[in-house]
Amino acid sequence: MEDHQHVPIDIQTSKLLDWLVDRRHCSLKWQSLVLTIREKINAAIQDMPESEEIAQLLSGSYIHYFHCLRILDLLKGTEASTKNIFGRYSSQRMKDWQEIIALYEKDNTYLVELSSLLVRNVNYEIPSLKKQIAKCQQLQQEYSRKEEECQAGAAEMREQFYHSCKQYGITGENVRGELLALVKDLPSQLAEIGAAAQQSLGEAIDVYQASVGFVCESPTEQVLPMLRFVQKRGNSTVYEWRTGTEPSVVERPHLEELPEQVAEDAIDWGDFGVEAVSEGTDSGISAEAAGIDWGIFPESDSKDPGGDGIDWGDDAVALQITVLEAGTQAPEGVARGPDALTLLEYTETRNQFLDELMELEIFLAQRAVELSEEADVLSVSQFQLAPAILQGQTKEKMVTMVSVLEDLIGKLTSLQLQHLFMILASPRYVDRVTEFLQQKLKQSQLLALKKELMVQKQQEALEEQAALEPKLDLLLEKTKELQKLIEADISKRYSGRPVNLMGTSL
């Protein structure tokens, strides 16, 4: 019997309510009685004496049977004056709480209510709070990862921006203005390249000319005409190259529309609506221009259908070039349009200049390879009758000439000059380059803003976690108290046998 007295009673928490009902400790219809008790408690707490402990019991916690017992004990002190000679209280407060306790003790309703609270806390409330805290921690890790990604992405885009600016030869402080300034400096850069070619290509051209004349037996045939011309006269005008005479007047094309467009586009009204405003501006200008043309020249369309002077395109320079190409009828000695450009500015002559440079480079590189190999009998006998300029060449001289040519080709084909040539040909290219570079900078700024947003969200998740953790600790504490009260109450019903509520994981 004594051994049986110490055998513990293990009850699975999830089945605690069924266990109490099956063993007739509680009524099957306990929920309706609990609703009646809750209504009476809500009515009773409206009229309570001033007491700090009572205020703590009534603030923010679910009032159950044991709270009611403590409230009744406190009321015995505050309502002592209402006690009659029979030991009963005439105070309505005491009567209300005594009735509540009596209803609780009927069919052990208090025990099943406490068990219901325990099951709800264990199965729902505590897991829900833990899940919310875990979600906050997960969000903090995710926001921290995104913060690092945004920081790295912003730095990468900013680095790409400055790297691209370096390729264009600008600092990036004022992209449009710096590009236009480079275009203004383009003639001086090309003049330097022309001067370098004029000083360094003489011997290389003579070697190539002598080799062609000796091998092909046609000494009168002139090779590399463009290089010869630049070597003699430098980066002169297309007019001088075409006619052989220096022009008396040079009327260079004026790109006046370019600064005006820059000044107009420099007005930034924000990140939205820019395209619509610019399109409306273009349409207004075109319509106005059309109205002016029709008013001044009412018969232009009928008299000259082929010479349409109205340019409906987006590129003002295209109109100017079209007119200048008809400048072959300019007075003698006057260079206009493409004729007024230098050889390295005009696309056709610049391409010819590059082609001849590459032709000369390939020849000299091959000749350097031939001179580096051991001379055979055929080679020696072949060049015995060659001109002195060919016999006096060495591998070192060939390599030096090749390096000079490579330097000239590298300067003309550099990315910076290629962009400047495109800007010179089309002012709209400035807009595209500016937009391309500014887009990288905007992406960097957006990523930086996103990083700040991730920091803010991470802080919000941290604050939410800090607010949930005390709630969880308090709920765990209350649930442990409920567990102890239930175990003690059931133990009394079984002669003090130990009771263990299993599956709480508190």
UniProtKB/Swiss-Prot annotation:
A motif (Shuffled ATG8-binding motif 3) lies at residues 310-313. A motif (Shuffled ATG8-binding motif 2) lies at residues 292-295. There is a cross-link at K450 (Glycyl lysine isopeptide (Lys-Gly) (interchain with G-Cter in SUMO2)). Its main location: endoplasmic reticulum. The keyword Secreted does not apply. Ubiquitously expressed. Expressed in heart, brain, placenta, lung, liver, skeletal muscle, kidney and pancreas. Isoform 3 is expressed in kidney, liver, skeletal muscle and placenta. Keywords: Cytoplasm, Cytoskeleton, Endoplasmic reticulum, Host-virus interaction, Isopeptide bond, Membrane, Nucleus, Phosphoprotein, Ubl conjugation, Ubl conjugation pathway. Residues 269-506 are annotated as: Required for interaction with UFL1 and mediates interaction with CHEK1. One of its GO terms (biological process) is positive regulation of signal transduction by p53 class mediator. GO terms for cellular component: centrosome; cytoplasm; cytosol; endomembrane system; endoplasmic reticulum membrane; intracellular membrane-bounded organelle; membrane; nucleolus. A motif (Shuffled ATG8-binding motif 1) lies at residues 267-270. Substrate adapter component of the UFM1 ribosome E3 ligase (UREL) complex, composed of UFL1, DDRGK1 and CDK5RAP3. Interaction with UFL1 anchors CDK5RAP3 in the cytoplasm, preventing its translocation to the nucleus which allows expression of the CCND1 cyclin and progression of cells through the G1/S transition. Interacts with ATG8 family proteins MAP1LC3A, MAP1LC3B, GABARAP, GABARAPL1 and GABARAPL2. Interacts with CDK5R1; competes with CDK5RAP1 and CDK5RAP2. Interacts with RELA. Interacts with CHEK1; may negatively regulate CHEK1 and thereby stimulate entry into mitosis. (Microbial infection) Interacts with hepatitis B virus large envelope protein mutant pre-s2; promotes mitotic entry. This is CDK5 regulatory subunit-associated protein 3. It comes from Homo sapiens.
